Each structure stands twice: as structure tokens, then as C-alpha cells.
Amino acid sequence: MSNQHTLLSSNLLPVGSNISTWWNFGSMLLTCLILQTSTGFFLAMHYTANINLAFSSVIHILRDVPYGWIMQNTHAIGASMFFICVYIHIARGLYYGLYLNKEVWLSGTALLITLMATAFFGYVLPWGQMSFWAATVITNLLTAIPYLGTTLTTWLWGGFSINDPTLTRFFALHFILPFLIISLSSIHIILLHNEGSNNPLGTNPDIDKIPFHPYHSYKDMLVLTIMITLLFTIMSFTPNLFNDPENFSKANPLVTPQHIKPEWYFLFAYGILRSIPNKLGGTLALLMSVMILTTTPFTHTSRIRSMTFRPLTQTLFWLLIATFITITWTATKPVEPPFIFISQMASIIYFSFFIINPILGWAENKMQ
């Protein structure tokens, strides 16, 4: 047998013959990461991390830098594509019970948290109205931490308010964190190839395996072509589709936007935060909205790994997806009835999934 590493040899990397298109999102995420890192590198050459020049430097990139508009729009739309792929990737993991591969799942959760932090820091960099106020609201949540809160917030801001030092350190963090994402992604992939991919049926994949190349690599290339075509179509026709109109105005600490909200991919967490009237409670709920994913490998009770043959759990899963979309929608609305109530109910259902799921698994075992 050849001494080549499994990841480098196509013949030594057999994959289950029945893995579906839902297994293509890993390679799509890798493509998004390469795209974001390369466009970000070129943008960093022209960007200026100064509160007086940041907004103007972004306009300079769009107007004066050759093909700067392609770089800037690809980077902005690419972030949305990244999160669409991430959320589908996580949903696939929940549906097919892939979280039982604990190391891969937990490293993936760490990746998600790092990615969210990176995207948040990046959203602040253009120094538009929504960038500034979203940063103010989210970083201010640190003050909810007992005893250390105020000190931590002052340390993060680099002063007693969001100012030039804040933007400088956010740029530094936004530049350095992608390298941590690349490292964590490598760990994630190595841990996955330790055991190999699962399949939609949740059966032993060793029974029927085929080489990754050409069978699955061509399938990957097709989905990647569709994704890149979609990205460039959005960039060409509606480049500001995911942008907030408020962010076309330069940051002004004296004027508060009517409705402060982060980018669409954080709205589910922001909606959960807003649904709780207590600051500390809201902050904990915000953290738990992501951290609760780490509990799934330890609360799985069903004898069957995948949800493919579990209709009760399937119903619960699709309720979770509907809840996720509902919270995202309510977070775009003002804090007033009926949106407060809808948001609170949706948040309860969201967290209930992780409690009811193991109970349903146990009930299904009894019914078999």
C-alpha cells in the first residue's frame, strides 16, 4: 500500500456511494473561505483603519481602485453565501445525526463561533451608521458580566466609548481570525477523515464505497459552479441586496438609527437576545443559541442515528427550521407588539427542540 496521506490520495479516500447533495456543502464552505481570504487580502491593501478615513476608503475601493468594486462586492456577498452554506451544513448534521462523531461536531461548533466573531468584526469596518451602532449594542453586552463587565468593555473599546482604537483592533482581529478559521478547518477535515463521512441512511458506510474522484469530485464541481454563478449574478444585478440602507451613511454617534440590527445571518441570535427583557438573561440566551449545539452529541437517545426513518423527530426538525426563519424575520421588525410575543414564543420553541429531541428518541425506541 502507498505511504501517501489519505487526504492527498484519491484512491485511498473511498466514500459511501449514497451520500447526497447535502454532503457537498463542506467543499462549498472551503471555496467560500478561499474566496473570502483572497478578496479580503486585496481589500486590506486599500482599506484604512481610521474613523475619519474608513468610510472614504471603502468608497475609494469601489470607485477608484481597478476592479475594486468586484473585490468589495464579492467579499460582502461572499459572507452571506458563507453563512447560507454554514446553516445548511449544520442543519444537515442535525438531520442525519452526524453530531455523533463528537470530535468533528465540537470542532465545527468552535469554527462557527470563530466565524461569527470574524463576520461581526468585518461588519464594523466600513464605519457606516449601522456598523457603528451594531458594534455599540453588541460590545455593550459585555457590561452584563458581573464584576468584570465594565473593565472588559473598556479594554475591548480601547477607551470609554467606541472610537479610533476600537476600529483599529477590530481590523486587526478581522485580519487575524481567518487564519484561526483555516487552522480549525484543517483540524475539522482531519478529524472527519479519521472516521470518514456518514450517509443519509445512517448505516455502516464501509459496506459500499467508491473513490471520491471522479464520482463525488464532479458532483462538488457542479454545485460550486451553481454557487459561484449565483454569487456573480447577485453581484452584477443587485450588489446591495444584503446591505442595510443605513450603512450608506457615515457613522454618527449623535444620531441613533430608528432600528438597530446586525447583518441578516446574525438576526436569529439577535432576535433571541431581544426577546428577553433582562440584559444578563438576554446575553446568556444569545450565547446559548449557538453553544446549545454542543449538547446534541451527549443527548442523543434514539437507536437510529439518522432522522430519515423517524417521522416524529422529522416533524420536530422542520419546526426548528420554521422557528429559525421566524426569529430571523421578527428581529428585522421594531420592538413592539405583536413582534415581541412572536419572538418570545419562537425562542422558547427553538430551545425546546434540544430538550424534546432526546425525549422523542427515547419514545421512538419504546415504539419499535
UniProtKB/Swiss-Prot annotation:
UniProt keyword Membrane present: yes
Organism domain of life: Eukaryota
GO cellular component, one term: respiratory chain complex III
Positions bound to heme b b562: 75, 174
Swiss-Prot/TrEMBL cofactor(s): heme b
SUPFAM superfamilies on file: a domain/subunit of cytochrome bc1 complex (Ubiquinol-cytochrome c reductase), Transmembrane di-heme cytochromes
Transmembrane segments: 25-45, 69-90, 105-125, 170-190, 218-238, 280-300, 312-332, 339-358
Subunit structure: The cytochrome bc1 complex contains 3 respiratory subunits (MT-CYB, CYC1 and UQCRFS1), 2 core proteins (UQCRC1 and UQCRC2) and probably 6 low-molecular weight proteins.
Protein's name according to its UniProt entry: Cytochrome b
Species this chain originates from: Notechis ater (Black tiger snake)
